[in-house]
């Protein structure tokens, strides 16, 4: 299961209702921050998610409304000694801007105690932890080098209740020990190993995150089948001409992609403050369900979607 915290859901400039792009993705002890718009540090503190174990930041692209918050956030991580190492993932273009921002603004005169690693992205899998694999895929937005991200839980085999019963493993302490230690010795002297009681492999939960985008149709295969898709929908469908001229998506674009790719749930973000969120959500629900329009500090659990 993934836990999402929407720290900034606005477009271009912050407003009274919305901060700029930032999404915290958590899975067990792993934490990934996708984009870091202006004011992200304040949003982190106000949202109560903290900065501990925040050692990976993924940049969709190098536009300032997605990256400017790096100065205060990374500077604070260094000042508070909250991490020994921080990895910034992004295109060459985005990382160049990030490096200039940090080297010339945050640390112009001294070397930070924080070890910052600049990891240049290419399409494909780029990060694997014990339980999560993250893949980058190209996204069209103006002339920028832009990426979206697909997060997938590692396939796992849980303990099977029927097998545990057949092996005579009582509920309670013995099953807990078997799950965590890998083996348990029963009262009759038999030793049961974890692999003897595993059920069939289960698909892990998946989600995709797309920042600014000018061509949703090109993303169908990249996001196909995910349990949840987070994607920008900066404009109402009535303003399609403006969306096209600015290389952004409409509500209809995002919903069409979700339908074509067979995603389980849809969350719309990067919202223009000109619209009433209730009207945006009503338009989206007429085109795809289940769907929600994210607000700052919304928290969403991502579990395997129930599909018809």
Curated annotation (Swiss-Prot):
Q: Tell me the cofactors it needs.
A: Zn(2+)
> What does the UniProt cofactor note say?
Binds 2 Zn(2+) ions.
Report the SS bond pairs.
none
Q: InterPro entries from the entry?
A: Metallo-B-lactamas, RibonucZ/Hydroxyglut_hydro, RNase_Z/BN
Residues the entry annotates as binding Zn(2+) 1? 61, 63, 142, 212
Q: Which GO terms describe its molecular function?
A: 3'-tRNA processing endoribonuclease activity; zinc ion binding
**E.C. designation(s):** 3.1.26.11
Q: Give me the reactions it catalyses.
A: Endonucleolytic cleavage of RNA, removing extra 3' nucleotides from tRNA precursor, generating 3' termini of tRNAs. A 3'-hydroxy group is left at the tRNA terminus and a 5'-phosphoryl group is left at the trailer molecule
Q: Read off the Pfam families from this record.
A: Lactamase_B, Lactamase_B_2
Report keywords, A-Z. Endonuclease, Hydrolase, Metal-binding, Nuclease, tRNA processing, Zinc
Residues of the active site are 65 (proton acceptor)
Residues reported in the UniProt entry to bind Zn(2+) 2: 65-66, 212, 270
Which family is annotated? Belongs to the RNase Z family.
Protein task: Zinc phosphodiesterase, which displays some tRNA 3'-processing endonuclease activity. Probably involved in tRNA maturation, by removing a 3'-trailer from precursor tRNA.
HAMAP family reported for this sequence? RNase_Z_BN (MF_01818)
The record's note on quaternary structure and interaction partners says: Homodimer.
Q: By what name is this protein known?
A: Ribonuclease Z
